[in-house]
Amino acid sequence: MSNISTDLQDVEKIIVLDYGSQYNQLISRRIRDIGVFSELKSHKISAAEVREVNPVGIILSGGPNSVYEDGSFDIDPEIFELGIPILGICYGMQLLTHKLGGKVVPAGDAGNREYGQSTLTHTPSALFESTPDEQTVLMSHGDAVTEIPADFVRTGTSADCPYAAIENPDKHIYGIQFHPEVRHSVYGNDILRNFALNICKAKGDWSMDNFIDMQIKKIRETVGDKRVLLGLSGGVDSSVVGVLLQKAIGDQLICIFVDHGLLRKGEADQVMDMLGGKFGLNIVKADAAKRFLDKLAGVSDPEQKRKIIGNEFVYVFDDEASKLKDVKFLAQGTLYTDVIESGTDTAQTIKSHHNVGGLPEDMQFELIEPLNTLYKDEVRALGTELGMPDHIVWRQPFPGPGLAIRVMGEITEEKLETVRESDAILREEIAKAGLDRDIWQYFTVNTGVRSVGVMGDGRTYDYTIAIRAITSIDGMTADFAKIPWEVLQKISVRIVNEVDHVNRIVYDITSKPPATVEWE
């Protein structure tokens, strides 16, 4: 199985070297917001590999390590000699200081450990251009710079950090001890914009329009006269991929809609009517519900569920593809966040992603992932640019394994039906309350827990349904949605009264992190 993804070699970009910060994806996202493409790269990247990538700038992210400890994340020192502008953030500043001859010590030893918002005072610098001399920033460091390298100057201080910003403007190397990527740093976006546009001299012309042109060209070059299969779920990601591919290769695209019996209420009909009818996509419907549910019988481990569904999904494709000629490629709606969350050099894999870790090694297709460099909100912007209507572009995210990962424990028809019906009620009431565009994602989960209840004159022992609703910008971090109590109450009353085998509703008030969006 080979993987053909977006070719960004010729795109002006700033790379972010990943040192394990919880915020490193936000750095990339903020740079893109400025109009410059940005992506994460391993901190193990060599200077020669950086030359091949040819970025206009490099950002060294924060991280949990201490530069003076054995085994801490390092950098190829030749990168500092490439002449490419560099910005070190937090650990990144400490690392460049350490490698270039300065001194870093535990902040407790220097008496200047800082966590939380602080006031930065800076002197004139291209990095701080058009920002106030005093500004609020977020500090989060247990170590501190006590001596700066030769030819560097101090440009920023705080009450507890004598070297909050340093630079060598002749070599275009900058370091800041705070985190400009988080919103707690009030002028953080301005600082990143100064680095990207003024110091790196980026044009700032990255846009979805450019992305469409680039991807269409790349898809046509890759596919040639062969045919492409797309697994169409009806969700935002696969729908956008479908419209993009059709724009690129027309009738060479064959969409296979696999009804695996794990869809939301009425979803199968919506997919066929909306994408097959309105947009004219060539859709083959595979009714495979019994096949999937038979394979999932007795399985309760979430990772095993994902693997089974991933394997069966592709095997269904194999069955359908065997009926077709000249099919060489399989398209997927994998996003950048999917790739990141499935593990990097600096982080453990939290859970295999359904678009990354569930594919069998003997798959007969080459893989095309046109969206795997985009965040979720960028995919929505891409859909709008492609002329797709809001009710598709702003549709709720839905995982590839479907309701299988919204049913805790073993999957049964009874459990699936409780989730289908309760989810339909939730979506209906959220829309009635005018909250459907304010809440990033919302759904129900059958927790697998039964509890005692009283309905009418009788005792019940039925399922507990959890409501999960979050607000987010890009899916990397999220907070639980503050749904008005009267709306929650109405949802709860309707579910208990209208959905069989349910007698209790709970609301998930956990943010991401520590929790993930989905329960499995």
Swiss-Prot record:
UniProt name for this protein: GMP synthase [glutamine-hydrolyzing]
Residues at the active site: 90 (nucleophile), 179, 181
GO molecular function: ATP binding; GMP synthase activity
Catalytic activity: XMP + L-glutamine + ATP + H2O = GMP + L-glutamate + AMP + diphosphate + 2 H(+)
Residue ranges of coiled coil: none
Database matches in Pfam families: GATase, GMP_synt_C, NAD_synthase
Species whose genome carries this gene: Streptococcus pneumoniae (strain P1031)
Pathways per UniProt: Purine metabolism; GMP biosynthesis; GMP from XMP (L-Gln route): step 1/1
